[in-house]
From Swiss-Prot:
[4Fe-4S] cluster binds at C185, C188. One of its GO terms (biological process) is iron-sulfur cluster assembly. Belongs to the Mrp/NBP35 ATP-binding proteins family. NUBP2/CFD1 subfamily. Keywords: 4Fe-4S, ATP-binding, Cytoplasm, Iron, Iron-sulfur, Metal-binding, Nucleotide-binding. It comes from Drosophila persimilis (Fruit fly). This is Cytosolic Fe-S cluster assembly factor Nubp2 homolog.
Amino acid sequence: MLDKVKNVIIVLSGKGGVGKSTVSTQLALALRHSGHKVGLLDIDLCGPSVPFLLGLEGSNIYQCDEGWVPIYTDASKTLAVMSIGFLLKNRTDPVIWRGPKKTMMIRQFLTDVKWEELDYLIIDTPPGTSDEHITVMECMREVPCNGAIIVTTPQSVALDDVRKEITFCKKTGIKLLGIVEIFVCPNCTNCTNIFSSNGGVELAHLVQIPHLGTLPIDPRVGVLAGSTASVLDELPDSPTAQVLRGIVQHLVALT
């Protein structure tokens, strides 16, 4: 039930392990920090990371007459979270489902969750272009979707998969809002590229979509995993916070 949701943003990645869920989580927290009511929907069925990243593992969801009720992280209900991880007894339990069952579950997540009034719903997807993504795109035809953000590291292998994501979005009619790159930053001021540099910038220029910023992987940000603390609150002067502010400003301007 997305009738109370004003804006829907999908977060994609061509490969796993590039920081997509971290970007989704911190983007949701940054939007909340900016005064918006936000929902975060984790549909990465085989690798749900959002409950761990927000310290919500072990939370129990329940169903009411109107559908599933998401987990709220605060009494003011400024951040609502839904994930397949809440349905698993153990974080290490695998989800061994065939395509049709995955499709059914994602449709339920997109249509049967009782979201309250939300300014933004961030959808964290699995990596790649699979049945899950096709299901999301089909459901988005029935609900206004603002577009997709693609998360990548700048090495050529990851960028090749990003090109596939871009083609997928174009074929399914999803607007591309921009690319976010992930680097490694061993200290506060000097960013070290362990891959090739400027790959995302050059690709964004080539396909004519915005390059939203480069998020350095700051060890201090990793410490925030397991809590609902935003980088903007805890590390307001960090390079990561500066990039997140820019992304939020870009999204708010578009919506």
